[in-house]
């Protein structure tokens, strides 16, 4: 029998396709329990062809949800179907957090805030530099480019195997963003103070190319948005070469904070116990 607190209070969700491996219910469940709040948060799988109907049920109240998180492959459609997407969502063309307010469906994207909050927690002062290198130009890189630019970085080099994808991002995010092919990586790393891997290289223990991080500034920070494994091959290489590293788990944890506050009315804290809980779950699967 479930906790009686789940029967009352706001109900929130995470939806995607597939969604069964999401750790978001663990994160929000931890906060509901530690804060002693009524409410529930659960995974709710929705196929792409059913997503518009799901959003309609959210808007008219028949779903019973106060809002929720949206992940792959629904972020772009969530943005388009929301009544009030904010400026972050509008620039990205994607939303990952939805909530009902004044009978309207509002939307934002918290990925960038999760990324910067993770660096603020794990390596304060990371933003004193003005040049960043972003390795990869997939969907995940959009929010990170936006967040790094908005934190004051003057030059952002996006390096991608297919340079056309990187050019699309440069066109979207303005003159501070520069597109480069993979062969230019060593050159654009010179003098950069932040290196961000947004590719899947090294995910789930896959092999990753050997990278020389020494062209970076001596105090540059190297971070990876991949968090399985926690220390990716790229992070291990950077650490071996003497650079401070920040893993990607904190981005997952911190991006969840704004939504929880919207649905349940209290701002939660990313603490060591939550991080340990998620790491234990990762190790168990």
Curated annotation (Swiss-Prot):
It comes from the Bacteria. The active site is at residue 75. It holds the Pfam family Shikimate_DH. GO terms for biological process: amino acid biosynthetic process; aromatic amino acid family biosynthetic process; chorismate biosynthetic process; shikimate metabolic process. Its EC number is 1.1.1.25. Pathway: Metabolic intermediate biosynthesis; chorismate biosynthesis; chorismate from D-erythrose 4-phosphate and phosphoenolpyruvate: step 4/7. The keyword NADP applies. InterPro entries: Aminoacid_DH-like_N_sf, NAD(P)-bd_dom_sf, SDH_C, Shikimate_DH, Shikimate_DH-bd_N, Shikimate_DH_fam, Shikm_DH/Glu-tRNA_Rdtase. Shikimate binds at residues 22-24, 71, 96, 111, 227. Keywords: Amino-acid biosynthesis, Aromatic amino acid biosynthesis, NADP, Oxidoreductase. HAMAP family: Shikimate_DH_AroE (MF_00222). Homodimer. Involved in the biosynthesis of the chorismate, which leads to the biosynthesis of aromatic amino acids. Catalyzes the reversible NADPH linked reduction of 3-dehydroshikimate (DHSA) to yield shikimate (SA). This is Shikimate dehydrogenase (NADP(+)). It comes from Rhizobium etli (strain CIAT 652).
């Amino acid at each position: 029998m479930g906790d009686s607190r789940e029967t009352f209070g706001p109900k929130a969700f995470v939806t995607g396709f597939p969604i069964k491996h999401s750790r978001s219910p663990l994160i929000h469940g931890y906060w509901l329990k530690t804060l002693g709040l009524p409410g529930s948060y659960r995974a709710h799988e929705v196929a792409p062809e059913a997503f518009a109907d799901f959003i309609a049920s959210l808007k008219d109240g028949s779903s019973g949800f106060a809002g929720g998180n949206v992940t792959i492959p629904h972020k772009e459609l969530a943005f388009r179907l929301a009544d009030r997407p904010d400026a972050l969502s509008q620039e990205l063309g994607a939303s990952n957090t939805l909530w009902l307010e004044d009978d309207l469906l509002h939307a934002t994207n918290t990925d960038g805030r999760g990324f910067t909050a993770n660096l603020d927690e794990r390596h304060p002062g990371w933003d004193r530099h003005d040049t960043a290198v972003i390795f990869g130009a997939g969907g995940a890189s959009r929010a990170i480019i936006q967040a790094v630019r908005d934190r004051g970085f003057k030059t952002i080099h996006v390096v991608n195997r297919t340079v056309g994808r990187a050019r699309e991002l440069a066109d979207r995010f303005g003159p501070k963003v520069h597109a480069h092919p993979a062969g230019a990586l060593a050159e654009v790393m010179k003098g950069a103070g932040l290196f961000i891997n947004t590719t899947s290289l090294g995910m789930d223990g896959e092999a990753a190319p050997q990278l020389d991080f020494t062209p970076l500034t001596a105090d540059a920070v190297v971070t990876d948005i991949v968090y399985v494994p926690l220390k990716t091959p790229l992070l291990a290489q950077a650490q071996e070469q003497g650079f401070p590293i920040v893993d990607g788990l904190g981005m997952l944890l911190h991006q969840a904070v704004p939504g929880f506050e919207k649905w349940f009315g209290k701002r939660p804290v990313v603490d060591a116990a939550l991080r340990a809980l998620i790491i234990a779950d990762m190790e168990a699967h």
